[in-house]
Amino acid sequence: MSFDINWSQLVEDESINNSIKEFLASQFSSVSLPSYIDNLTVSDFSLGDKAPEIIIRDIGDTFEDFYEDEDGPRNAGAPTTTATSGMGESDSSDDEDTRDGLTGEVTLSETTESKTQFAPQPLHPIPTKLRRSHTTSAATPLSSHAHLNSLYAYNLTNVGLGTLNLNSATPSGRDTPTQILNQMRTGPNSPPISNTPISSSKKSKRGENDVQIIAEVKYKGNLHIEVTVDLFLNYPSQHFVTLPIKLHITGFEIHSLICIAYLQNAVYFSFLCDVSDDSQADYFNGAHMESGGNFVEYVSGTNNKERIDIIKKVKIESEIGEVETNVLRNVGKVEKFLVEKIRSIIREETAWPSWLCFDMSD
């Protein structure tokens, strides 16, 4: 099997950048803003030209949860034929052979190949529709709580490079993300896995080309988000001065385990857990916060009590011109506010049991 990922061709497609930009804009539009800012908009987005480092940890059947999402109105009467997204496909027998024989790591960067090759499908058309699919807000409190409890039970926040065992049994669609990761853990004292048989209705929905990849992704690139916002000076009176500022958010660092599922006419994406690095930093490094600084770094670390951070590090550069010191301090507040909201949005919308769906039916 061969995977050929042309990152430069992917990021040059404006439909991808625009879809993500619209997604972020819709999320920010629903955020409750503090009294000192208004008119928060996402003015630009770019994936950047630096590709992430990807190591495939497992290839298997897709999670049942994705088929529950396929039951929605979007897929009523939808055909089971697959669309192209830059990843070639082999026949079903080749897929099974590859899954059974996967015992090592496959590293992907900008272009990756393995020994057995097949003709890749053309990169275009690329999906132009980014759908918000299953999220924790759509699930019942009990079901969301159950998902999180299972992840806590296996301490997935601290999964590291040495904790994955590719010689374990090949996972199937009956497995949850927690069970997948548990099967790849080393150590004789790992708790047993209790699987529930797949229902006949779920089996009937599976297409012969449906496939799921569990991969470790490490990203330290130049993804760029441009945000414009009006900053208010509320002294000596409310909204005494309105100052438009532009913020460039970049320097994202991510090291996580992800799930990518390809089924029928859609690609599903979800972060499963963070992968621990050798060194960790403080939750926030706000050394430049008081001065505004025009350049601030924010680092998340082990002090964060959330299950998953996803974004380990991010930088913000502000364009405000020559202004007074008290204005710079307010800009520092805006920067910190944006970082917290971006991390929250990414975590809530893309971390399991939430996911993003790239609708390829159009």
Curated annotation (Swiss-Prot):
Which cell locations does it reside in? Mitochondrion outer membrane; Endoplasmic reticulum membrane
Sorted alphabetically, which InterPro entries does this protein's record hold? Mdm12, MMM1_dom, SMP_LBD
Instruction: Give the Polar residues compositional bias ranges.
Output: 106-119, 170-187
Q: Fetch the CDD domains from UniProt.
A: SMP_Mdm12
Listed A to Z, the keywords are: Endoplasmic reticulum, Lipid transport, Lipid-binding, Membrane, Mitochondrion, Mitochondrion outer membrane, Transport
Record domain SMP-LTD: where: 1-361
Gene Ontology molecular function terms on file: lipid binding
Annotated membrane topology is: Peripheral membrane protein
Cellular component (GO) terms are:
endoplasmic reticulum membrane; ERMES complex
Pfam families (UniProt xref): MMM1
In which broad location class does this protein mainly occur, judging by the first location in its UniProt entry?
Answer: mitochondrion
Segments of this protein annotated with the region Disordered: 65-141, 170-207
Q: Where is the composition biased (Low complexity)?
A: 192-201
A single GO BP: mitochondrial genome maintenance
* Signal peptide interval: none
Give the quaternary structure: Component of the ER-mitochondria encounter structure (ERMES) or MDM complex, composed of MMM1, MDM10, MDM12 and MDM34. A MMM1 homodimer associates with one molecule of MDM12 on each side in a pairwise head-to-tail manner, and the SMP-LTD domains of MMM1 and MDM12 generate a continuous hydrophobic tunnel for phospholipid trafficking.
Briefly, what is this protein's role?
A: Component of the ERMES/MDM complex, which serves as a molecular tether to connect the endoplasmic reticulum (ER) and mitochondria. Components of this complex are involved in the control of mitochondrial shape and protein biogenesis, and function in nonvesicular lipid trafficking between the ER and mitochondria. MDM12 is required for the interaction of the ER-resident membrane protein MMM1 and the outer mitochondrial membrane-resident beta-barrel protein MDM10.
Fill in the domain comment: The SMP-LTD domain is a barrel-like domain that can bind various types of glycerophospholipids in its interior and mediate their transfer between two adjacent bilayers.
What is the similarity comment for this entry?
Answer: Belongs to the MDM12 family.
Q: What is the name listed in the Swiss-Prot or TrEMBL entry for this protein?
A: Mitochondrial distribution and morphology protein 12
Which species is this UniProt entry from?
Answer: Meyerozyma guilliermondii (strain ATCC 6260 / CBS 566 / DSM 6381 / JCM 1539 / NBRC 10279 / NRRL Y-324)
Q: What is the lineage of its organism?
A: Eukaryota, Fungi, Dikarya, Ascomycota, Saccharomycotina
* Gene coding for it: MDM12
